[in-house]
A protein has these predicted regions:
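A conserved acidic beta->alpha catalytic loop
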Residues: 29, 42-51, 92
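Acidic donor-binding/catalytic loop of UDP-sugar-dependent glycosyltransferases
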Residues: 49, 90-104, 185
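Conserved donor NDP-sugar-binding/catalytic core segment of glycosyltransferases
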Residues: 97-128
Length: 240
């Protein structure tokens, strides 16, 4: 939805691959935002009904030439017209005031990017795994509030200024993992990241599917390597 007013336009960039079971929840949560001046841009490499669902919900869909979240984000970003850009993963669900809070926080010119705190999507977590998942979620929120430790944060939803994004370019499409750490590390040269006092719901499906300890260590290791050594981890397993 886009309206003509003085409030800055937010270009919402969503990479998708076979997200037909989840993307509708994100798109509906976007429609329920208190802040209404936005456009939805999807970079898609799906084999399922994801692009059709997105189009029905009013999103503009662009076919990525290669698989990967970086390619999806980049093709959508090239079509973005907004003063602000919101990079959101397809399995995130927003609470109603995320964009409103982000626009206000970005009035501070020393803030380069903002992100909500996260809550797990409880319905997809087996009861016996809830304690460890909630512990990891609390750790992720701590890292967001602490402005990242070693460059590691939770990047499922980040809103920033387009002019700052233009300074750092695009996501590295050669990276299969930690491409977000690499991108936001470059962006952090121009200001601080700030935690918003609002929440979004985050999917821990990959932790559950692939094993919680293994997935946690996998993400941590590669995020820290990317942040510390500033180099691509091109040999990593592709997980998305």
């Amino acid at each position: 939805m886009q309206i003509k007013e003085s409030k800055p336009l937010i270009s919402i960039v969503i990479p998708t691959r076979n997200e037909e079971k989840r993307i509708g929840k994100l798109l509906r949560s976007i429609k329920e935002q208190t802040y209404k001046n936005y456009e939805i841009l999807v970079g898609d490499s799906s084999d399922d009904k994801t692009p059709n669902i997105c189009k029905k919900e009013g999103a503009k869909v662009f076919r990525a030439k290669r698989r990967g979240v970086s390619a999806g984000r980049n093709i959508a970003l090239k079509h973005a017209r907004g003063e602000l850009v919101a990079f959101i993963d397809a399995d995130v669900i927003l609470t109603r005031r995320v964009f409103e809070a982000a626009v206000k926080a970005l009035e501070n010119k020393r803030t380069v990017g903002v992100m909500p705190l996260f809550k797990p999507i409880a319905g997809e977590i087996p009861k016996n795994k809830r304690p460890i998942i909630y512990f990891l979620n609390d750790l992720g929120n701590f890292l967001i509030k602490a402005n990242g430790l070693g460059g590691f944060r939770v990047y499922g939803c980040v809103i920033c200024r387009r002019k700052d994004v233009n300074k750092v370019g695009y996501f590295d499409e050669k990276m299969h993992i930690s491409e977000d750490t690499d991108f936001y590390r470059r962006l952090s040269k121009y200001g601080k990241f700030k935690a918003l006092d609002v929440y979004a719901y985050y999917s821990y499906r990959r932790f559950i599917e692939k094993g919680i300890p293994r997935t946690f260590l996998f993400y941590i290791k590669n995020a820290l390597i990317t942040a510390a050594f500033k180099k691509n981890q091109n040999e990593l397993e592709r997980i998305r």
